[in-house]
Amino acid sequence: MVDITAPVLDNHQVGPRLHLMTLSAPEIASSIKPGQFVHMQIPGMEGHILRRPFSVYAADVSEGTIEILYQVVGFGSERMTKLAPGDEIAPKLIGPVGHGWAAPEKCERALLVGGGVGAAPLFLLFEQLVAAGVDVTVVL
């Protein structure tokens, strides 16, 4: 787990009340496991003591980036929609947090089931399973 300042590379709407944020976070991208998450201090909300947890939707080790898929449900997530490339998640982004999931070693087929924004962390597991040659069915 690391504490870093993470520049925003992209942040755009992908659906009704759904946004996808790309952050430069090579230390996290290189060590994140499916099911792990990050704690984010949202700029402009430094008065709030607790950081907010967000699942990591995708990670690109070669680019050193992570992607956060989030739903706008309140003041904090509404504030996140205003972040633009060049803004920084500061003072710190903490992660990866949690134990995460590991694909079974001997697995031929897998069924991944998720709903809403809670399905976001399944994407990393999907990628890992497909790379291992597993036949994956996804139900969202």
Tell me what each language-model feature is.
Residues V2-D87:
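Ferredoxin-reductase
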